[in-house]
Amino acid sequence: MVTLDTLRREKKAEIIRLAEMSGCRNVRVFGSVATGENRSDSDVDFLVDLESGRTIFDLARFLGDLRDLLGAEIDVVESRSVHPHIRDRVLAEAVGL
């Protein structure tokens, strides 16, 4: 099971490296992993800022890289595209690595 502590202590450097390769900045975790309510089958939700000129293909690459690294289901959301109905909750939950 992926935990916030594991991400911070064991995977942070590699996650940041992968993010930079894909043009992702300000990597944060939100959802059940961030709140400590995750289970063994929980996915890991990442919130990122995408550099200008980057595309959805860069996000998809980052998502695939994270899936390979963590061995878990992953969601990657660009901060400007968070749905307005959940934006406040996502931003309140989001924690940096």
Language model: regions and residue ranges:
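Catalytic core of pol beta-like nucleotidyltransferases
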Residues: 1-26, 34-40, 51-97
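Conserved histidines in hydrophobic membrane contexts and catalytic metal-binding motifs
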Residues: 29
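Structural signature of FAD isoalloxazine-binding scaffolds in flavoprotein oxidoreductases
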Residues: 48
